[in-house]
C-alpha cells in the first residue's frame, strides 16, 4: 500500500502531531508499505523517517508561536505531488490549513482520506489571544472533517466535540504509552532521594503551552508529602 501523510507540523519541531506521524511511519515501514510525508520545511531533519520520502514545502512561522509553521500550498500543487506518488490513501495529521488543501487534492484524485483529529484548534485560538476567531475555527474544523472519508479521534471527549460539529464518520484511535521509554524498570531511587525523599511525586511530561492547562496541577501542590515535577518545553516554559 502507498500512504501519503500530510502533517500540519513536522520535524525538527517535536510535538504530539510530529510524534504520532513518526510512529505511523515506523509501523507502516514494518508492514512493508511505501510512504510520503508532505509537511512544512522548518529546518534540518536528522531523525530516522523509516524510508519515507519527503516533500517539504515553504512555510512561515505562526506569530504567536513561532515554532509552529504554516504552509500556504495551493491544492493544485498538492494534487500534482499526490498524482506522482499515486497513494492508495491520504492520511491527514491534525489537518487545518495544509490539510484542507490536501483534502481537496485527495478528492480531485478520488483517493480516500483519513483525518486524524488530535489538536483542539478552537482552544488554541482562545488561549493564544484570538477568542473572536474561535467560532470561525470551529466551523472550519467541522467542514473539514465532514468532508474526509473517515476521522479518527483519540478520546470519547474529542469524538463528542466532533459530533457537535456535525461530523458523523468517526472512529476512536486511542493513544498508548511507549513502554520502551516509560516503564517501572527505569525508576531511579537515587534520583528520587535527591529531589523528593519520601514524598509522592506528581509529574507532567509534555509540551508546556497554555492549552495544556498545566496550571491545574497546582491543586495538589499543597498536599502534605507531595512534590510536583515538570519535564518539557514550549512557549510557557520560563526563560
Predicted regions and their residues:
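An aromatic- and histidine-rich active-site surface loop
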Residues: 90-117, 122
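Nucleotide-sugar donor phosphate/pyrophosphate-binding loop at the beta->alpha transition
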Residues: 112-114, 121-143, 153
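A short, charged, and often flexible helix/loop element on the N-terminal side
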Residues: 52-80, 92, 132
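Conserved donor-binding/catalytic core segment of Leloir-type glycosyltransferases
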Residues: 194-225, 229
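Donor nucleotide-sugar binding/catalytic pocket of nucleotide-sugar-dependent glycosyltransferases
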Residues: 39, 55, 138-187, 193, ...
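N-terminal subdomain of nucleotide-sugar transferases
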Residues: 1-56
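Glycosyltransferase donor-sugar binding loop
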Residues: 43, 205, 226-239
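Short hydrophobic "strand-cap" motifs at the C-terminus of beta-strands
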Residues: 6-8, 154, 204-206, 231-232
